[in-house]
Structures are given as C-alpha cells and as structure tokens.
From Swiss-Prot:
Stated name of the protein: Gamma-glutamyl phosphate reductase
Family membership: Belongs to the gamma-glutamyl phosphate reductase family.
Enzyme Commission number: 1.2.1.41
Source organism (scientific name): Prochlorococcus marinus (strain MIT 9301)
Keyword NADP attached: yes
Subcellular location: Cytoplasm
Pfam families for the chain: Aldedh
Gene (name only): proA
Keywords: Amino-acid biosynthesis, Cytoplasm, NADP, Oxidoreductase, Proline biosynthesis
Function (record text): Catalyzes the NADPH-dependent reduction of L-glutamate 5-phosphate into L-glutamate 5-semialdehyde and phosphate. The product spontaneously undergoes cyclization to form 1-pyrroline-5-carboxylate.
One GO MF term: NADP binding
Catalytic activity of the protein: L-glutamate 5-semialdehyde + phosphate + NADP(+) = L-glutamyl 5-phosphate + NADPH + H(+)
Amino acid sequence: MANIFEVPNPGNDLLEKADKVRLASIKISQTENIDRIKALNFMADCLEKNSKEILEANSADYSSAEKKGISRALLSRLKLSKAKLNSGIEGVRKVGELADPVNQIQIKRELSNGLILERKTVPIGVLGVIFESRPDAVMQISSLAIRSGNGVILKGGSEANLTNTSIVKALQEGLDESGLDKNAICLLTSRKDSMAMLNLEKYINLIIPRGSNELVKFIQENTRIPVLGHADGICHLFIDIEANLEMALSVALDSKIQYPAACNAIETLLVHKDIAPAFLEKAIPLFNSNDVKLIGDRKSVELGLEHEASAEDWQTEYLDLILSIKIVDDLDEAIIHIQKYSSKHTDGIITENLKTANRFMNVVDSAGVFHNCSTRFADGFRYGFGAEVGISTQTLPPRGPVGLEGLVTYKYFLKGDGNIVDDFSLGKAIYTHKDL
C-alpha cells in the first residue's frame, strides 16, 4: 500500500486553508436556522447563474478523461448533464427544507432545585470529504455541511478538477452573498493535499471517504481523525425454504442488477437446499438473460450453474454483473456464512415465516437487515433522510446511511444558581433528577 499512497505532512499553504475553514466553521456553528437556509438558497441561485460555466468545465474534464482512457463507469459518474446539474441545484434547496439538526434538545432534566441539565445537538466542526469523480457530490456534501452548521474541506477526483472548482466557486459566491463566511467551503485539487488531510487532526473533526475500497481502508488505517465510512459492501440475500418463489426471484434480481456497482447490491445469494432446485430452475435463465455471470458452490453447479466458486469469491465485492450462489442446509448455516463474510452493510432474507425472519434480523449484525425487500433500499434518500453524506458499517453510531443527523454531535449544558457538590455531600441539597 505504501507504494501507492503516502501520507505527507501538510504544507503551510494547506495549513492556512484548513485554519480558514476552522475559523469559518466556528462562525457558521453560531448561525440561526434561518440564516443557514438563506445561505443554501443563495448557493443554489449562484449555481444556476453559473450553470453555463460549470457545464463547460465539465465538458473539458470529460474530454480530457476520455483521451486518458478512463473507464466507462468513471466517465458515466463524471458526466454532468444539464438535467443532472439542475437536479443537484434543486437538491441544495431541498436540504434547506429538512429539519434543523442543530440545537435539538435531547435531554432536559432538573438535577436539583435550580440546577438544570440539557443535552443539545451541535455541529461537529470541520468535515474532510474525499470522494470519487462525481461532481454532483460537491453540491450535495456542501449543502449538508452548511445545513448542519459545519465547515467542509473537499477533495474530489483529479479528473473532475475543473468542474469541482467551478461548482465550489459558485457555492462560495452564494455563501458570501448570504452574509456567511465563504471560507466554510474549501476545495483541494492535488493528490498530495488529499493525503496530507489525514494529518490535519487539529483542524478536521471527521473524515468521510467516498471512493475505492483500497482508498477507504488506507484512510481508516492512516489517520488519527475519526472516519465515517465503509470499505466493502458485501451484501447477502438468503432465500428461505418458506420463501414465495416469485417474490424471491424478483427481489434477488433487483438486489443485483438495478445498479450492480452500488455498495448495497448483493454479491452473494444463499439458498435453502429444499427450495434450491425450484428456485435455480427459474433463477438461472432469469439472471443469464440479464447478463449476470453466476458463480456457485459445488451443489449449485450440480443444479445447473456453469462456474464453480473459489474461497475468494465469498469475500469479493464484484460491483459488477457477477453473483455468487451458495446452497445452505438451513437458517443457521446461512447466518454463519453471513457473519463470516458480510461487511456488515446490508443483508436480507426472503421468507413467509415471520419467526424465521425475526431471528435472522435479530442475529445478523449488519447496519441494515431486510425482510422481503431489495437490499437496494439501503440508501439515505430512500430512507427519507433527504440526502446522504455516506454509509457507515461500524457498530458505533452513526450507522448505516448517514444524513444530517450524522453531521452533528452533542454536548451538555448545565445551568445553576451557585450550586456546589459539597451541599449534596452534607445533606443541604438533594438530587431530584426530574425530566422536564
């Protein structure tokens, strides 16, 4: 890994930029809800005003990327059509319609007469976001950061530098026109700076990587800054003996082909041995007709699959039209397989037996456990979060798709009237611990 990525110490220029964002984030954290909504609307207006320049920059990025032979998948994510840009601009406005995540009272409690405790949500501070070639992510992430009262340092893929620069220029213009500090949004354009970000623990409070598995793992292992993200998306779907066959086929197909490059697409299908013959009889031609390469264990090969799986396949995130199939004896074997190979992202079961479903969902330790539905629903927008900054597969919160609520933390506010602990020790005062 060391020969691919290095973590250099930040130079003076980067330190200066980071400090400007830090100072701007302090100002933004003190703003009222109405001011942040106003800022988002100004940001959207400036994006509209600069649409022509943004699209021209994207066209230049796209042409350059094509000449360099960048993959079709990356080119697709890089392309910013007028419709996609307009959708992104509308998304910025819609973030302003979401409930304010800041200053929400989670606990209000009288500890004693005249001694009141509150726990309230507060902005995290400065977000460091390293993402792939999608320029629309700049609009989404920046709007979420401002809405939650945070500053943000962005580093996109070099293939989108012109587009990202043009978008950030418009966003900063909008912030400035709204009366907020434009330094709350900062874009880095060099690979060296993106790696040096990992050593900015005095300035950045949370790193959010949105890129390849290799990059995410490297970041998790090489920074002292907390990281919100997931390296792998190895998702499973278990077809139980009591599954509705037509439902199982429909959900399995959607979970794989609706968008195979997504982290919530399934990579392994587990099938109960007693339903396997009937299921595979229909599933094999169905998946074949949708250009899905099926790789299976010996039992599934005996039932018609052409390619036998290796041990490596069970722990591979294909992000492609490839699906591993394993036939299991029962629910217990399915759970054991999932617990061994799952990345704890999203795993599902298809069954008409509610008791079986509940056991599966209670035992499988993933951020999302689904019953009778596609794993592709594991998404912040589909959950009704309005927008998603990333997905976390860690056990501690935030977990799963992370929206605005994952971009705030909390602190305790204790207000008294000269209260001292010694009075309680001497019996002069008593704790009431009464929720208000």
